[in-house]
Amino acid sequence: YRSAEEYISEHKSMGKIQCLFKTPKKDFVTIKKGRVCLHPWAFISADDKLLFQESNCYNTKPEDHWVFKTLKLPQAKHLKGKALFLSFRRNYWHSLTDDSSLLNLLEATSIDLESFDHIICERPDNVASQQLQEIWNINQNKLVSLTENKHLECEELSFLAGSLSLAYTPILQTREKILSKIKNIQEKPSKRLIASREDATTRRWLNQSECVELLTGRFNFECILPSERNLFEQAEIFNQAEVVVGIHGAALSNILFMRAKTTVIELRYRGQEGNFSSASCYEELSKLVGINHITVLCNGEERPELRGRSIEDANILVDKTELLKIVESCL
């Protein structure tokens, strides 16, 4: 089927679709005897057919989907009752934007998380992710890992579908919920931050130490490692920033907490682009928050060993002279 909508229109007794947000369109899909598979990524209907639009990652034609190149899917684990698919990623960006937005939309339409017997979502592996789940009172006893189980068949499966674009209202609701828990927020942002990814294994900033030395010495920047801080500490320090410099990656998710008319300088590999790239996600978030967003395209080294992620997760080499000029123009 081209989409869940097409499937349900042909099999009305097998599911329903509820519009949660009109622009960008966000639909809440519920299907009976639905399946979700991790490798290859796929939502599958009760009659054993792919729901292409909801399962599409890297292909423009249904017949090119990886599910049709797979000899056998992993054995499915059966879940009785109602299951909500939230996420299969342990990824700060997706938790803060996609997952939190869905939870806000469900809350706004009075869909109670407690009405689900299972929540398909990974258990937190860091304090920030744990705090996010606590904000929405996610019952840890209901969590089911798709990463561990690979393939789940649900008596009733619900999930979000529609546009991948960020939705203004639920995004800002997440921002306000988190910032409201922080005491003594400064009136005027004053910090100049460099968001480091030195603990990451992909998308590394190859000459970070040289750039940090220049920015801290000339412009009084402070280099931080956001992953070492909890959710509220990350939100607070980004809320205090007038300028943030950082490589494209999870740490920049915290620009959600910055104030309007502040500045983000995103460092990105120049080859990162295309229909199935996340290249513009931080620019989109900055636009919603009202931030001045400057993207610096950099040379770098691709990672062939990462296969489909070789360009998306390439390491970068920043032109120091160009960076200094851009930073100076922002101060």
Regions found by a protein language model. Name each.
Residues 1-331:
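The feature primarily captures lumenal catalytic ectodomains
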